[in-house]
A protein has these predicted regions:
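ABC transporter nucleotide-binding domains
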Residues: 1-73, 78-92, 97-98
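Compositionally biased, intrinsically disordered low-complexity regions enriched in proline and serine
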Residues: 25, 117-118
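Conserved beta-strand-loop-alpha-helix hinge in the C-terminal portion
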Residues: 95-117
Length: 121
């Protein structure tokens, strides 16, 4: 019940998964991942294909979950990183090429997208 409330699925709980929007399907995935109270939550492209409202809701939900758990987020949507993450690790060809707090990027005024392309090209 707590997970249903946390993921805002209460009104959708009686629907079949195929009846849900992409955003609610993402929420169901998060709820399923949270059932066994993992210490670490691994999310692969959790904001892909969401409409603007769903995007904000899922971002906020991930940030809220991140207050109590380690959340590893895999994404190719560079603009999402500073909106969700407090640390960035860039992996290129199986090797870590960057491992830094987002605060450092912000203080130094680094353009994350350009930095990513420089490290991975």
């Amino acid at each position: 019940e707590d997970i249903i409330e946390k993921t805002n699925l209460k009104l959708e709980r009686s629907k079949k998964i195929e009846q849900l929007s992409k955003g609610y399907k993402q929420r169901v995935g998060l709820a399923a991942a949270l059932i066994h109270t993992p210490d670490i939550l691994i999310l692969d492209e959790p904001t892909t294909g969401l409409d603007p409202n769903q995007l904000v809701e899922i971002r906020n939900l991930i940030k809220e979950i991140g207050k109590n758990k380690i959340v590893l987020l895999s994404t190719h949507i560079i603009q999402e990183i500073p909106k969700i993450c407090n640390k960035i690790i860039i992996i290129n060809k199986g090797k870590i090429v960057e491992n830094r707090d987002m605060d450092e990027f912000n203080k130094q005024g680094v353009n994350l997208e350009n930095h990513f392309h420089r490290l991975t090209s």
